[in-house]
Amino acid sequence: MATYFVGDIQGCLDELLLLLERVEFNREKDQLWLTGDLVARGPKSLETLRFVKSLGNAAITILGNHDLHLLAVSQGISRVKEKDKTAPIFTAPDSEDLLTWLRHQPLLAVHSEYDIVMTHAGISPQWDMPTAIECAHEVESVLLSDKWVWLLENMYENHPDTWDVTLSGIERYRYIINAFTRMRFCHLDGRLDMECKLPPQDINNDELVPWFELENRLPLSHKVIFGHWAALMGHEGNNVIALDTGCVWGEYMTMYRIDDGKYFTQKAIEQ
């Protein structure tokens, strides 16, 4: 059995299928772990949802910011973004089944054999592993409750930007969602910065650092595999592996086989 991790798909299904073919992926014995954002600007968001759902227990996927946005659009909370190609999902005959399945996906997944934790954007530098797991479960429970639409209606803000165990209600949930699905940079005191999307090398001040490079970041017992930040282009270090390498932007898709540490890449197919 082999375990493969792949960065953001964003509807680029053909590239994913080519990678799976190259490694002779066997859904009967192998596992595919996906860092979230199954949908968005790529040409086959609908087909990607169908494919990953069809893999059943052979696929582990988590929620990314684009996945949550899709759920919000489905409830009339948001609109389809101009460059997204997700509109066919809402008119598909299996739309309700796909969206319900997506809503049941977690924010965090742990691979206990390899001491790996997978999230979409990372783990707040103000959390240890038990806190991260607990926080993920809190929001996952709300998404599965009758308050899930309320949660999506109120998630679109950048505050609070710092963790406090006394946070409650929507402020607590909003911080958790932002940390797991939107985070890139932090201020030196650990506050999340939700505005800057530049590559780290383009930051010309000492006030922002990537979340995983914060000096006083709480130590984690697991290595973090995440996607979301294509500008990192596969950064490995600081006990993290960044797997989004910008396939949807014309770069390439990256697959990591954890069993032997081997990487596989697939250049983006011109659309």
From Swiss-Prot:
This is Bis(5'-nucleosyl)-tetraphosphatase, symmetrical. Keywords: Hydrolase. It is an enzyme of class 3 (hydrolase). InterPro entries: ApaH (IPR004617), Calcineurin-like_PHP_ApaH (IPR004843), Metallo-depent_PP-like (IPR029052). It holds the Pfam family Metallophos. Gene3D superfamilies: 3.60.21.10. HAMAP family: ApaH. Its EC number is 3.6.1.41. Belongs to the Ap4A hydrolase family. PANTHER family: CYTOCHROME C5, PTHR40942. It comes from the Bacteria. One of its GO terms (molecular function) is bis(5'-nucleosyl)-tetraphosphatase (symmetrical) activity. Hydrolyzes diadenosine 5',5'''-P1,P4-tetraphosphate to yield ADP. Coiled coil: none annotated. It catalyses: P(1),P(4)-bis(5'-adenosyl) tetraphosphate + H2O = 2 ADP + 2 H(+).
